[in-house]
């Protein structure tokens, strides 16, 4: 049976105002433009979100993933994915982003696809405990997660990851370095436009921004503690914007405590990309306070929020970790000791006292992102990996070959 097309499957909500959805769209569109038809399969049962406008080469198939917990949701999604796949022709490539959709495909790889691409942005054996602390002591679940990850790592013909730290960890888990490609995240420079830092105004509170997941692995608690320290000396408002799970909302509100009553903290739901960019421009400093933990230092990551902040021109204070150093020099971002609210507060004060330093960081950060991290560069790297490592012919090459044959 002849193989046809690419299936890009992801156990992620799409569309959504999250980094994962931005990443999925960028990669699916690039694959469609380069190689022809792409079937994009993702979680699409969010109420009130319109179907995204995608290129003609990408067909979106939203699937449900309802369930009382993550395991139930994953099993529901797998069942829907299996039903969707029934009777479909064999794929040329299947591209997955996690074990939740990837494991059953890896098990049946020989009958489903010519090639399997496993894009590793994170691994549940490391990340799950931060979202669901009760699973940390479930040894049986952890064993299953590691086993399924290993099956996907071994079955993949191409492994893609956005971080060299992650690549090193995957090799330590037995991944073949010859099949591994590091492709950092990108930024839409037309959405995250540049503006120089805001000029200070007498009487206006200093406005800090934290964007992203409200979890300990991202360091939101360090941002709150730094806000408390700064309030001793000057008026401050810290804006927290991003997804907030129900069971973590209460803990976060407790952590905010008096800061909410004082009006020193505001909580915002996730914003569309254009509004998030405008919010950056309305703030004085962006905080990326990643802690030194196994998710950030062992598994690794490529924090999209850091790249987006650098693109906007608002000065950034970020943890001095390898995953940050890979994206930003100390002339582009003010890097501070991880896990230290005091270091964050002192860096913010330094920017306030030395606006010329903030302006220099701002311009250098934007220049770095324009040079190294436009989405086009990541898309080109992915297309090259498909062509060079998997031998997939570009659509233009196929049409030229067909035209020559018929001439």
Task: Identify the function of each model-found stretch.
Residues 44-46, 237-253:
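Glycosyltransferase donor-sugar binding loop
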Residues 157, 280-299, 314:
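Acidic donor-binding loop of glycosyltransferase active sites
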Residues 171, 187-204, 219:
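Acidic anion/phosphate-binding donor-loop and adjacent secondary structure
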Residues 242, 250-277:
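Nucleotide-activated donor-binding/catalytic signature segment of Leloir-type glycosyltransferases, i.e.
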